[in-house]
Amino acid sequence: PASVRTAEISNWTGKAVAGPRSQLELILQRGESKKPGIYFLTGINSETGKPRVYIGEAEVIRSRMRNHLNRDFWKTVIFFVSKDENLTKAHTKYLEGKLIEMTKAADRFELENTNASGSHLPESDAADMDVFLAKVEQIKCA
């Protein structure tokens, strides 16, 4: 789709915002882009035809997205933030690390990330982020 889309799940604190690269400025004008979160930049490798992805995290999505304008491969962005302001840097690094691990294990994408990430969280925070991650996967696959 060539427009900006959002997604939420009932009783979940997260929110997704997605759209094509051509709509990036419109996406970055949204209030959600001022929050910490995780994001995916996706495209297709023109030589192999295989999907490519870069997985990242940021304290301010908007600022980090502008840093990726020099990466030519991506055509679509989707990012996830918390509606209740409860995602911390440690949370986003934990989520990023888990998502990179999952993507490597699935072996369906060419992963653009060169550095692994991750963060150790207290057990209760890790459990909360695993629930958040399950919802991210649910929306991403929809």
Predicted regions and their residues:
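Conserved catalytic cores of phosphodiester-cleaving nucleases, focusing on short active-site segments
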Residues: 54-56
